[in-house]
Amino acid sequence: MRQALYFMSLGFRLHDTMIYAKKNPMPAGVSSKRYHQAWEYIFILSKDAPETFNPIMTKAKYGHLGANMKHRGRDGEMNYVKTKRNEYTKVRNIFEYSVGGGHSTKDKIAFQHPAIMPEQLARDMISTWTNLGDTVFDPFTGSGTTAKMSLLLNRKFHGTELSSEYCEITKQRLEQAPTALFYESN
């Protein structure tokens, strides 16, 4: 939360807040005086209104049913109108992913980093907030998950990382990543 407040003090706008929920978080231990840390914030910050929003859609639970809507006319009388519901709806702002070996990535080298991001989380965020050919910037590249998914989704990537060890992990992951023959559209 402090990061969002800091960037807002620099003139960025907080456009959206989402939650990354870990289905199988690392246990805190019996002697710990706090609950298991099972979620993290995802902040979408921008200088202006975001130019891109490609929401992840899911089939609406009751999309096949009509809805009765009340509407009060100018004369004060209540009118009931049957309307068609949308067949699809945007997903909730809580994104749940399993983490750890066999879940976050199949790249064994990535686990040399202590806190890797699930590839599906990176894929979902990149697909939502960018278009094909856009540039993705990750100021904390870590094990290179954002870099890998950006390139597989046909985005350009720029990143920074202080640790030369983590830069080497990223380099190896990108060298091993399959080349996208067919690019996904949004």
Model feature map: region roles:
Residues 175-186:
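Positively charged, low-complexity nucleic-acid-binding target-recognition regions
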